[in-house]
A protein has these predicted regions:
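Short alpha-helical scaffolding segments that buttress acidic/His motifs in well-ordered protein cores
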Residues: 196-200, 241-252, 289, 330, ...
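Glycine/serine-rich anion-binding loops at beta->alpha junctions
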Residues: 86-102, 138-144, 276-279
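A glycine/threonine-rich phosphate-anchoring loop and its flanking beta-alpha core
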Residues: 10, 110-209, 306
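Active-site segments that bind and position negatively charged phosphate/pyrophosphate groups
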Residues: 202, 206-329
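ATP/NTP phosphate-donor binding region
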Residues: 1-88, 343
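C-terminal charged capping/lid subdomain of soluble metabolic enzymes
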Residues: 311-387
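Short Gly/Thr/Asp-enriched flexible loops that form oxyanion-binding sites at enzyme active sites
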Residues: 77-78, 97-111, 146-149
Length: 387
């Protein structure tokens, strides 16, 4: 096991009716800006519940944050925060609203003579402070409710980049599985795929004898395999929804990634697909992951074989046959959830691969993976294999 420094300060209020504890998490004299997405939180009544919980407090609203939150939209919120002297941000939504609000939190406190896109260009390394934020989660997927990372898109340039800063980690997160009952099937399936790939990005790398992290990761994967399809078939099954919600949080709150090598190349290649073609984040992960594993099967051999045996119970055949079977089982799982796994399934013929590689190079993504050996040429082969 490698050395690590783990700090997970987000308070989790989990369960049915957990919103009852919301008010006491926010300073009583705060000027609160509630952020949300396209308006589903209004239709479902979640926003009304939040407003009721904060009755009598100084509250403003900012809606319209997109899936793959756009810098251009977020800068309008930054302007509002600065003008209205907002002191606390409250997310009501999923990972996109969370990521966007993390940017708002950091950008509002960023030096006014510097374009806040600099936050993305520097990966968040120069963030000195941020407006504190909390979350009422409505979509389990990204784990953004209890981590310090975010991914932001810039429409005008076709960029999608990530940043990380302890200053933007949510102070608390309210996780009520009931809020997920009304999610569209596509979002449920995407969330399961997202959590699954988050887990394997930290697990299917190379062995460092990190038994606890490995078995935590395997537990998350087995839970998603068992309950992901059930969440689609039984949308109001509380226990299923609770397990999927908690799995997504655990997949990316730092615990399973502590002291182990991490990959993240699937995400980096996927980000370029989203930025260029507008695919859902989880769709890009489902496209890239099987192709990447096949390409990197030799360097990932030990962990792919462990994954095959412990997650899919694949024990028969040669090493290569078991790896093939594990990759096929993973692809089949995504397909059964309704998330196709080839570029051609989305009407893409691969003609944009040179442009995708150019963007990877522009963003410095030329030595990806746990071994930093996924060069542009390897990325090209992965994209080609994903057609």
């Amino acid at each position: 096991m490698n050395n690590f420094n783990l700090h997970t300060p987000t308070r989790i209020l989990f369960g049915k009716g957990a919103i009852a504890g919301l008010r006491e998490q926010i300073p009583h004299d705060a000027r609160v800006l509630i952020t949300y997405g396209g308006g589903s939180v209004k239709k479902t009544g979640v926003l009304d519940q939040v407003l009721d919980a904060l009755k009598g407090m100084d509250v403003l609203e900012f809606g319209g944050i997109e899936p793959n939150p756009a810098y251009e939209t977020l800068m309008n919120a930054v302007k509002l925060v600065r003008e209205q002297k907002v002191t606390f941000l409250l997310v009501v939504g999923g990972g996109s609203v969370l990521d966007g609000t993390k940017f708002i939190a950091a950008a509002a406190n960023y030096p006014e003579n510097i374009d806040p896109w600099h936050i993305l260009q520097t990966g968040g390394k120069e963030i000195k402070s941020a407006i504190p934020m909390g979350c009422v989660l409505t979509l389990p997927a990204t784990g953004s409710e209890s981590n310090a990372g975010a991914v932001i898109s810039r429409k005008t340039t076709g960029d999608k980049q990530a940043f990380h800063s302890a200053h933007v980690q949510p102070v608390f997160a309210v996780l009520d599985p009931v809020y997920t009952y009304t999610l569209p099937p596509r979002q449920v399936a995407n969330g399961v795929v997202d959590a699954f790939v988050h887990t394997v990005e930290q697990y299917v790398t190379k062995p460092v004898d990190a038994k606890i992290q490995d078995r935590f990761a395997e537990g998350i994967l087995l839970t998603l395999i068992e309950d992901g399809p059930k969440a689609l078939k039984e949308p109001e099954n509380y226990d299923v929804r609770a397990n999927v919600m908690w799995a997504a949080t655990q997949a990316l709150n730092g615990l399973i990634g502590a002291g182990v090598p991490q990959d993240w190349a699937t995400h980096m290649l996927g980000h370029e697909l989203t930025a260029m073609h507008g695919l859902d984040h989880a769709q890009t992960l489902a496209i890239v992951l099987p192709a990447l594993w096949n390409e990197k099967r030799d360097t990932k051999r030990a962990k792919l074989l462990q994954y095959a045996e412990r997650v899919w119970n694949i024990t028969e055949g040669s090493d290569d046959e078991r790896i093939d079977a594990a990759i096929a089982a993973t692809r089949n799982f995504f397909e059964q959830l309704g998330v196709p796994t080839h570029l051609s399934d989305y009407g893409l013929d691969g003609s944009s691969i040179p442009a995708l590689l150019k963007k990877l190079e522009e963003h410095g993504m030329t030595q990806l993976g746990e071994n930093h050996d996924i060069t542009l040429d390897v990325s090209r082969r992965i994209y080609e294999a994903a057609r």
